[in-house]
């Protein structure tokens, strides 16, 4: 199973996260398939490559709860559902 999840980066007490597509069995900071963006929790800032994200969602990648919260704040799911309904 493929998941869209966070990969911790940064130093101690100064974390930031890459939003990545990875196999569910891979370790948190281990191997990943593709990077989709990043998230800085201290500044509450996230940057997401929408084209890559929509492609992985269309393929059927599962999204973790934390990434789901980030995506909903950015409006990713709303736009994805609009795109999906316009294709049909």
From Swiss-Prot:
One of its GO terms (biological process) is translation. Pfam families: Ribosomal_S16. GO terms for molecular function: structural constituent of ribosome. GO terms for cellular component: cytoplasm; small ribosomal subunit. Keywords: Ribonucleoprotein, Ribosomal protein. Gene3D superfamilies: 3.30.1320.10. InterPro entries: Ribosomal_bS16 (IPR000307), Ribosomal_bS16_dom_sf (IPR023803). It comes from the Bacteria. NCBIfam families: S16. Belongs to the bacterial ribosomal protein bS16 family. HAMAP family: Ribosomal_bS16. This is Small ribosomal subunit protein bS16.
